[in-house]
Every structure is written in structure tokens, then in C-alpha cells.
């Protein structure tokens, strides 16, 4: 592999995303064609082969009433994380806690192997702030977990094997593309996954402004998790000088 850092095309693409995200239309009338296509495809398959969103939500409510242990555990984790999800936006009408709760518990019912995994709260909340309806946010979340990300990326037991594999790949890529930066982080005793696993599992929704997150997702919905590596490398390149100036892990 080359040691020249992210390609000029990667940098130009990320810069274009940043510029486009500053345009007024980026949040208020955001309707990504790629996102809607993925949602509609998932809805069509789901309606043809299983129950719609409302049925999953109703079944989740019934399962909770029956005392389903797995779903009760998922509900408890969801409630803890809801208070931590975009706290600065709560109370401003930009984030519906009830809608986020509904979508996450319906997804946990639909996919018990995943149930609820921390980080899905940020993905779900960002989808609802596009804004999407609960139904479309639900099918978008299903698309992310079931179609776009590798197996075992989000798991109920939090072993998240797929995510850990991606972190090993990302660490290798960073060492190849930005060896000085990777070496400096190693000298500081800072594992790259300390921050990058959050980037990948939250699809950057926790760390980037919503408008820019959605632009990243345009690429993600085409290339899947490969897009996350490109964005992650460019972000590290953009912050390289600042990181290299740090002399301690605390900095």
C-alpha cells in the first residue's frame, strides 16, 4: 500500500460534502434519493414477506406485557441511552424521544439476535431528524443493520465482532496511509479504536453535525461500510497537525 495518505479524490469528496452541508437546504428539506431508495426497497421486501412496522411495534408491546426477558432488557438499555442521545437537541422540538423509543424497541423485536445495541440510538435519532416518519426510520435502521453493515456489527451481547474486525482494518489502513500519526498515537498509548469505533458504529452521527452526517450517509448508502473507512481516514488527516502537537493522552 502507498504511504501517501488519503487520495486527493478522498479529500476532495469530503471537502465537497462539507461545503454542501452548509447550504440552507441541507437539513430542512433533506430527502436523499439514495436513502429513500434503500428504505423503499426494504419496505417492499418486508411487506411482501412479513409484517409492517406497526405490527412489529404492537408485538413488542405485547412481548413486554408478557414479560419477555430479552425485550425487557433491551427496553431498559434503550431508556438509559435515550437521555444521552443528543442532549443539546432535546427540548427544542428537534428530537422525539417517544419516536426514537418506538423505532428502537420495534427493531429489537424484529431482530432478536441484535436486540438493542448501544450506538443504534444515535443512528435512529439522526434518521428521525432527517426528518423521516417512524416507519421510514424503522426500515432505514433495518437496512443499515441487515444489508449495509457486515454481520455481527451490532449485537445484543455487545461482542460486536464485525465492528472489531473493521477497527483492525482501519488501524492497519491508518498505519499505512498516515504512519507518522499512527505512530504518534501509539507512543501516547492511545488505541485508535478509542474514538474510531464510535465513529463507525454511530455512522458518524454522534460526532458530525446532522447536515454533514447525512451527506456522509449518501455515500454510505451506496458503498456500505467502505465509505466509513474513507471518511475516517480523511478526518484523521484533517486533524493530523493538532494530534501531532499533543504530548500526552489527556491532550
Where are these regions (language model features)?
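Helix-rich, well-folded core regions that mediate interactions or catalysis
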Residues: 1-251
Amino acid at each position: 500500500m502507498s504511504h501517501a495518505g488519503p487520495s486527493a479524490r478522498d479529500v476532495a469528496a469530503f471537502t465537497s460534502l462539507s461545503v454542501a452541508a452548509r447550504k440552507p437546504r441541507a437539513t430542512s428539506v433533506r430527502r436523499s434519493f439514495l436513502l429513500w431508495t434503500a428504505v423503499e426497497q426494504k419496505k417492499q421486501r418486508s411487506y411482501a414477506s412479513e409484517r409492517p412496522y406497526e405490527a412489529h411495534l404492537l408485538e413488542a408491546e405485547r412481548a413486554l406485557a408478557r414479560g419477555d426477558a430479552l425485550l425487557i432488557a433491551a427496553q431498559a438499555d434503550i431508556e438509559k441511552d435515550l437521555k444521552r442521545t443528543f442532549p443539546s437537541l432535546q427540548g427544542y422540538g428537534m428530537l422525539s424521544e417517544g419516536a426514537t423509543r418506538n423505532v428502537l424497541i420495534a427493531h429489537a423485536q424484529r431482530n432478536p439476535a441484535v436486540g438493542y445495541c448501544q450506538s443504534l440510538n444515535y443512528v435512529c435519532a439522526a434518521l428521525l431528524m432527517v426528518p423521516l416518519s417512524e416507519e421510514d426510520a424503522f426500515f432505514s435502521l433495518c437496512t443499515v443493520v441487515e444489508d449495509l453493515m457486515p454481520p455481527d456489527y451490532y449485537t445484543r451481547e455487545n461482542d460486536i465482532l464485525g465492528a472489531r474486525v473493521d477497527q483492525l482494518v482501519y488501524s492497519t489502513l491508518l498505519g499505512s496511509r498516515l504512519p507518522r500519526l499512527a505512530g504518534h498515537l501509539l507512543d501516547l498509548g492511545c488505541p485508535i479504536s478509542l474514538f474510531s469505533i464510535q465513529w463507525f458504529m454511530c455512522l458518524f452521527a454522534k460526532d458530525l453535525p446532522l447536515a454533514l452526517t447525512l451527506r456522509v450517509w449518501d455515500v454510505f448508502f451506496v458503498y456500505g461500510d467502505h465509505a466509513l473507512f474513507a471518511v475516517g481516514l480523511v478526518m484523521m488527516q484533517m486533524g493530523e497537525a493538532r494530534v501531532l502537537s499533543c504530548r500526552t493522552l489527556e491532550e
